[in-house]
Amino acid sequence: MDCSFITTNDLRRMFKTLDKNQDGLVTLDELLWILDKLGWAEHTPDELELIVGKQSLDLDEFLRFYYDAVLDSKGSKKNIDVVADNDEAIARAFNVFDVNGDGYISAEELRDVLERLGFEEEAKAWDCGRMIRVHDKNLDGFVDFEEFKNMILHV
């Protein structure tokens, strides 16, 4: 599986992970937590409530929120504020995966982020090293910003 995009099944698993009390709802605090982990949390809880219009989301609303807020109608990635400069949005996404801030994404960092996002089993099963190698055009064993940007823009 390629980590260059989040599928609907991935979102369903995220929802299930976020829904700690298994009531079928994700609260705004839980939504802010995942947005923060993805590097897209730029709103206060009150601002997010104004955007969402309620205190919690069911699965369908969660999926709709993701697709409306994170993806445009053509499916291209954008951040919550729909910044005009794609590099800024891509840099924020890159920084989610560049855990140690050295400017490179390693297989270990990819695995760590997947686990933080609730994909513990998948992180163990997926070959994160292979995923890095697929996008590592300069063959240094890491994905740098330009390689990440190229991956994002050509998904």
UniProtKB/Swiss-Prot annotation:
In this chain, Ca(2+) 1 is annotated as bound at D19, N21, D23, E30
Keyword match Ribonucleoprotein = no
UniProt xrefs under CDD domains: EFh (cd00051)
Query: GO MF terms on file?
Result: calcium ion binding
- Domain EF-hand spans what residues? 6-41, 85-120, 130-155
Does Calcium show up as a keyword for this record? yes
Q: Which residues bind Ca(2+) 2?
A: D98, N100, D102, Y104, E109
Free-text function comment from the UniProt entry: Potential calcium sensor.
Under which name does UniProt file this protein? Probable calcium-binding protein CML44
Q: Highest lineage ranks of the organism? A: Eukaryota, Viridiplantae, Streptophyta, Embryophyta, Tracheophyta
